């Protein structure tokens, strides 16, 4: 669909920074008002079209919407992503809608969540099935309050380099010698 929710959320956060710059440095109240209005419209659109009710997870964020009631429920490994929302500054880790969304995207209900003998995490429609991205594993750790989960994710990243000692774009959850973009580190 045409409206990517994480991208719009990131834009909302950036507009806050831009507003501060325009207000404090450029002292341009007209431009500041336009920024505030645009941010309001984006946030309103997210609230209106980007939050869905899932029968198992409750209120959660969609990944994409068309603005007509249709939506895509998934998450992609790249940033901005739904998983990265607290890191980006859109919400806190304990936000209920975020936590419901997190439970969804870190489950097999997310079509790009993979689990194997070497790793489990979020992959992408841009790489092969059963491949997870270290960037998503890192973001999962950065947005977790669970020390055991964080340590498990760090170990997963360190132990899945295909014996190259480099992080790659993605790697197979069952065989880390199979990876994409060896120059990606």
Features from the language model and the residues they span:
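Extended ligand-binding clefts on enzyme/binding-domain cores
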Residues: 1-12, 25, 31-133
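Extended amphipathic alpha-helical segments enriched in small hydrophobics
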Residues: 5-26, 146-156
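Generic alpha-helix signal with a bias toward terminal, lower-confidence helices
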Residues: 17, 97, 117, 169-170
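Arginine residue identity/basic-tract feature
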Residues: 19, 23, 34, 102-103, ...
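Alpha-helix C-terminal capping segments
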Residues: 22, 105-106, 139-143
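C-terminal capping/lid segments that line or modulate ligand- or cofactor-binding pockets
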Residues: 72-92, 129-185
